[in-house]
Amino acid sequence: MNLTKVWNTTLGSLQVQLPRHEYNTWVRGATLLEIDNGVAIVRAPNAFIKEGLESRYLATLREQLGSVVGFPVDVRVVLASPDFERFDGAPHNGRSTENETRRTAQSLPLQPGSSSNGVNHPLERTPPQQLELHRAVRSSMLNPRYTFDRFIIGPSNRLANAACMAVAEHPAQAYNPLFLYGGVGLGKTHLLHAIGNFVLDRDPEVNVLYVSSETFTNDLINSIRRQQTEEFRIRYRNIDILLIDDIQFIAGKEQTQEEFFHTFNTLHSAGKQIVISSDRSPKAILTLEERLRSRFEWGLIVDVQMPDLETRTAILRAKAEQSPVPVPQPVIDFLAQRIQSHIRELEGCLNRVTAFAQMYNVPVTIEVATAALSELLDTNRRKRVTPDAILREVAAFYSVDLRALQGRSRSRNIVIPRQVAMYLLREETDSSLMEIGQLLGGRDHTTVMYGCEKITEELNSDARLRQEVATIRERLLHSAG
């Protein structure tokens, strides 16, 4: 059994299934060490992750691993040890743990410096603070893979990328605060990390803190419980750049909003940069205090939108270049057409497809992709459009009469659009072959099956047809949305 392939397939499923912040926080850094006598040994990078996996995700891990290996497994989580090496193919962030810890630790002061005038100095860390350091590293972690160079730019995110680059090049001079908002998995977190990585690459002495609003809230609660609120304020206010993710979660939390209000004021008045992300605009966060809302609107507010087909294709192509197995362009086009949501799901699906192909030692094809993603596609497809909408859109795209499309004509200018309609009706609706045949002039199910198979085969080799089908799908999605 190839543990690398098993774990990569499991991670692909979990990346699609779990919210982004949960996957990145709890699952991404874990590794599979062995499966023996029905027990899977999963290694956690630290005690915090180990506790979280055991308390929250054991059932999910059992289910997903069992689904991949084909038999029930129990899961035991162990703590990382120097005696073990990360196995080949495990997800990693491209840098050694030592370098990563150095980089992230230096971005967050843990103790007050010798100066009280707001100037940041490197702060000394002592062994008794080791547990505190681990917690700080987690909350300030910058993923070195998330850089501007690796961010795929399209019409949906061009302004957001430009604004973040301006902030990274001239902190607290361009837009302060910068507020990014948009749905999950659209690249907001990538851009926040990219700002931090860009700044630290230019000047490692800059104090950069990336943190989620949930972590901010938990740190505040813990500091109150331990009577360490002053240490909390030093930690969050003695920095140069604050990158705070998912700010919408502080809405309705009165004490958290109070503390963040004063943190914001302290940083802003000291000329420090603040970058905020949210799943909605400040005005749409209903239980957000007005004084915070008004401050969020001081700078620039940028909407990050859903990626279009061209951007989805570019994202998948860039991801495929890092794949251990070749991913042909027809498969990239297929995934870009079928996964019409967010970037996280796109990447998770590609990971699952390539791991599936590795596990069964087969090349990546559209058929393999369909098999690997069968559960996801069955869940997501057939729910956006109606058969009538498909017929109308196909007729309009090919400039043919709808009655001719549904009639008995066998002329070539009708046959190809009709076969495309058969294919889309089969792929995008719950219609049976017989029902599709009735919609298209009373044809029998074997004729419909032939038409669907013919289009499926030609999509592998005909770039023009792929583009035509993709365009029709885009129009259907927009009209249904």
Swiss-Prot record:
It is found in: Cytoplasm. Its main location: cytoplasm. Residues 87-103 have a biased composition (Basic and acidic residues). Residues 358-481 are annotated as: Domain IV, binds dsDNA. The keyword RNA-binding does not apply. GO terms for molecular function: ATP binding; ATP hydrolysis activity; DNA replication origin binding; lipid binding. CDD domains: AAA, Bac_DnaA_C. Residues 71-140 are annotated as: Domain II. Residues 1-71 are annotated as: Domain I, interacts with DnaA modulators. The keyword ATP-binding applies. Residues 87-128 are annotated as: Disordered. Domain I is involved in oligomerization and binding regulators, domain II is flexibile and of varying length in different bacteria, domain III forms the AAA+ region, while domain IV binds dsDNA. Plays an essential role in the initiation and regulation of chromosomal replication. ATP-DnaA binds to the origin of replication (oriC) to initiate formation of the DNA replication initiation complex once per cell cycle. Binds the DnaA box (a 9 base pair repeat at the origin) and separates the double-stranded (ds)DNA. Forms a right-handed helical filament on oriC DNA; dsDNA binds to the exterior of the filament while single-stranded (ss)DNA is stabiized in the filament's interior. Belongs to the DnaA family. This is Chromosomal replication initiator protein DnaA. The gene is dnaA.
